[in-house]
Amino acid sequence: TNSKNSLTVAAVLGVSNYTGPESVSTTSFSNYGPTDDGRIKPDIATKGQAVISTESTGDSDYASKSGTSMAAPGITGVVLLLQEHNYNINSSYLKSASVKGLLAHTADECDTNFFGADGPDYKYGWGLVNAERAATCIMNNGVTSLIYEGTLNEGESYELNLEALEGEELIATISWSDPMGEVYNSSVENMRDYREPVLVNDLDLRVSNSTL
């Protein structure tokens, strides 16, 4: 079902000092979305160019390598550290959907020239991973941030009332694990550019000002 619950990683050039979206540039080999049914992929971006990795020519050899296969392990490492951080604080692990939402929520904006607008796009997903900001979000949960994990049945809604501080950003992110959709027994040719939605659950997030 087009990796709807997985983390798909874009490979970008290394960023030594992030100062804004213009600090991030994609690599020539990193593919981009959308999925056939229009969903955003990839989900997150990290360095995938000239990454020092192990080399099979010897037992202790390393080499500089590039590819999304170098970017994805970087995100895997970030996720493991965040899970360890959450366990050290809360004695529990985050659900997979929470991890995905946390990475999206705390990512840095990437180059906007490709699509001409801020926000998630089909080239970088929700942006450049920011592990420090994600860890801070976990550490400050219930104080300056809130990570809520729950279950919604069909037709249900969840409402949260909070007070935003003047001059401070209010950012909200929703993420969920979607169940398996319909399996199509069709040829590869017929499935190419198949536009039927693969999402089983389509959840919406709404933010409103109760004082207006």
Residue positions per predicted region:
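Short consensus segments that form the blades of beta-propeller domains
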Residues: 18, 90-92, 192-198
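Hydrolase catalytic cores
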Residues: 45-114
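Catalytic-core segments of hydrolase enzymes
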Residues: 1-53, 104-107, 171-179
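Beta-strand signatures of extracellular beta-sandwich domains
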Residues: 204-208
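Extracellular hydrolytic enzyme modules, especially secreted metalloproteases
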Residues: 4-17, 27, 95-101, 105-134
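Secreted peptidase-domain scaffold signal
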Residues: 120-201
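Extracytoplasmic/secreted cell-surface and envelope-processing proteins
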Residues: 18-20, 60, 113, 182
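Solvent-exposed strand-loop boundary residues in beta-sheet-rich modules
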Residues: 57, 209-211
